Each structure stands twice: as C-alpha cells, then as structure tokens.
Amino acid sequence: MKSDFLNRGKLLIGFAMILFCSGLYAENDLLEPTWVRPDTDFSAFNKFQVMPLDVSDVRLLRPPWAMDDPKDWSIDNEDLQLLQDIYRDVMKAILEADGGYPVVHVPGADVIQVEVELLSIMPYIRPGKRETSKGQSYITLGSGEVNAKIDLRNSETRELLLLLEGEKTVGQEYKEHNDTNIVANLEYMFTQFATRLRNAMDRVHGK
C-alpha cells in the first residue's frame, strides 16, 4: 500500500512538474497550478475529451495606453468563433500526433476532460484597426494578453484534478499587426499549452 501511495505521488509530481516546468518555455510565459488534487494517478488516463473553448463571458480589456481612446473596443462573434476553431484544431493535432492520445467526444474511465475558459482578452491594438492614418503598419510584441482558467477533470465523475488560472501573452516576437500574424500568435499560444499537456502525459506514461 505504501509503495502504491509513493508511486502515485511520483506520477502526480512528474505530471505537474513537466506541465509547468520553467525549462520548457520562456519564464514570462508560465502558468502556475492553482490547485492539484492529491494522490491523483494521471497514468490512469490515456485519452482526452477537449471541451469547446469557453468564451461565453469573456471580457475585452483596454491596454493602459488606450484608456482615453474614444472609439469603441469590442470583439465580434466571428473573432470569438475563430478563437474556438483554432483552439480545437491545435489541441487535436498536438495531442494525437505520432501515436499520441486520442481526442474523444464521450466520457470514459480513462478519459481526462480539458476545460479552458477565457476570462479576459487585452489586445494591444483596437480590434479592427490595422494601419495608422498614414498607412503605416503597427509592429507589436505579440498580439495582446489573455487571462484564462483551465480545469482538468475526471470525465466520468467530473471530479476536478487540476486547476490553473493566469495571464498569457499571445505571441513572443515583434511582428506586423495583421490578421495573418494574429492567427499565428494564437496558434503559437495554444500549441504551447497542448504541447505541455502532451509532454506531461508522456512523462507519466514513461514515453
């Protein structure tokens, strides 16, 4: 019994460490776990149920330098749908690639449920604004910041296994502010998260 307890502890620590290890990505890009259920055996899971990205109550925040901008700052439903589509496609591609972990649509004893809710979005440039009045393009370090909450749950019981919440920068390089680079930055952000999740699961399965 003691050996089983210690083994579960190692699996829990291994999962958490690889998921939030500072060596994986830039230090300013970390999300620290808010809570992890003790004694969770993550090796019991080998599939993912990725729920749709929750944008039902996301708030659009202005950056400090745009507080006095008289123009409206808002995000439309098409942009929110784009966020959801990119998230869905990236998660499935990364988690399933090269003999990875199936992304399924129904709960199961070996299925871990992934729920991500976007709490707020702070774009660096007003949505819809692409050029200055002189036709000059904007160059920004990333596209903005998001605040998100992530739950990992037992898909059958809905028991919470891991919770994290924090801010993430959307993109890590100076690029022209245009639709192509905004999409690329979003793909990069979601790829980081999916890769961490994949690496953490590989770790507990000894891959």
Each predicted region: which residue ranges?
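Surface-exposed short loop/turn segments
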Residues: 29-31, 97-159, 171-172, 176
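Bacterial N-terminal signal peptides that target proteins for export
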Residues: 2-13
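A structural "domain/chain start" motif
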Residues: 25-86, 202-207
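C-terminal/domain-edge helix-coil "capping" segments
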Residues: 27-41, 143-147, 156-163, 167-207
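Second-shell loop/turn segments in exported
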Residues: 71-83, 101-103, 176-184
